Amino acid sequence: MHFAQRVRALVVLNGVALLPQFACKQGLANGELVRLFAPWSGIPRPLYALFAGRKGMPAIARYFMDELTTRLANGV
């Protein structure tokens, strides 16, 4: 289930879930969602991207990797 579907299910069913902040940003801003356990967050998990090397990598793939690295470093 995609994050948008999970958030919609939370709102419709009055549920509780652990979701990434980016998935809940709009719902938190418009009041549909409320953050529970405010100082708490989930366990950080590593994220890996495997590729053969940048030599010969298409420009769009390089851009994607650079953008992903930047956004994740800034908390999305």
UniProtKB/Swiss-Prot annotation:
InterPro entries: LysR_subst-bd (IPR005119)
The name this protein goes by in its record: Putative protein YqfE
Highest rank taxon of the organism: Bacteria
Pfam families reported for this sequence: LysR_substrate
